[in-house]
Amino acid sequence: MILQTEKITKQYANHLALDGVSISVPKASVYGLLGPNGAGKTTLIRIINQITAPDSGKVFFDGHELCESDVYSIGYLPEERGLYKKMKVGEQSMYLARLKGLSKHDAEKSLKIWFEKFGIQAWWNKKVEELSKGMAQKIQFIVTILHKPKLLIFDEPFSGFDPINVNLIKNEILNLKNEGATIIFSTHNMSSVEEICDHITLINKSRNILSGQIDEIRRNYGDNIFEVDYRGNADDIKQKIDASSYSVLSNVEQKYFQKMTIKAKNVEEKNTLLSQLISSVEVVNFNEIIPSMNDIFIKMVEADK
C-alpha cells in the first residue's frame, strides 16, 4: 500500500468532518474517493496533503508515517483551480515546477515535452487571463504531474472539459498508472469511476460506508437479475424454468426477438437457468444485470440516512 489512513477524525467547531475514516490505497492503482457534497472527502484530501492536521488518527505514506518532506512525492490538483491571471503561462508553469523541486533545466525540458504532447506550444507566452477554463485546467494538470510524484490526487479533474479533452485526461491518468503512479480520484461522475478506477471508498456523513474493488462491489450488490434475448414462445420458457427458483419480471417483444427479465433466488442458479433457456427457445443473448456504481452510490447513501 502506498497510502493508509487509520481512524482519521477531524472536528470543525460543531461539525464533525471525519469520523474514524480508514482507507488503504494500493500502489499503481486508480482509487476513487466518492461521496455526496459535504461528506468529508475534501477534508481527507487536505489531511493527506498536510494542508490541515487530523485531531486523531494517523496517515502512512510509502511505508512510513507521513512527514513534511513527503509533500514532494504528492501531486494535488484541487477542485478550486488557481493560477495567477496576470502571469504568462510559461513563466507560471516554470514557477510552479520549481516549487516542486525541479531544476530550471529539467522544468523547462519537461514542460516543453508536455506542451507539445497536448498541442499547446502556442500558449507559452499567453497570459493566463487569456485562457478559457478548460485551457487553464490543462496547464494545471501538467504542472501537477510534471515532477512525477508517487501519488497524484485529482479532485474533479474533468470539470469544465469538453468530451474530447475529458477523454484526453482519462487516457493520461491511465498512462500514469501504467508507469507506476498511484492516483486518488475524487469525483461525482460515476461513469468515469467505472471506466478508470480499480478500487473505491464511499464516504457519507463523515464515515467510510463502503470500500473495495469496483468489480467485486458491483457483483456483490447485484440482485441476481438476468436478461435473455430470444426467439420463441414466452410460455415455453415459463413452463420450463423452475418457479421455485426463478420469477419472470417482464417480457417485451422486440423487432427481431423478445427480451425477458428473470430474477433468480441466488446467483448459483445462473448456469442452470441458461441451460433451461437453451433447451426451450433460441437464445440470442444472455447476461446478468450488474448494478452501476451510480445505482450503488444512491442505494448506499439513501440507506445511510
Language-model regions: role of each:
Residues 1-3, 302-305:
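Short, Lys/Arg-enriched, disordered terminal segments
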Residues 3-5, 10-204, 210:
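ABC transporter nucleotide-binding domains
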Residues 70, 221, 301:
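Short, flexible helix/strand-to-coil boundary loops that buttress conserved ligand/catalytic motifs
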Residues 93, 108, 115, 167, ...:
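Generic structural signal for individual residues within well-ordered alpha-helical segments
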Residues 171-261:
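ABC transporter nucleotide-binding domain
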Residues 225-303:
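Short, charged/small-residue-rich alpha-helical element at the C-terminal edge
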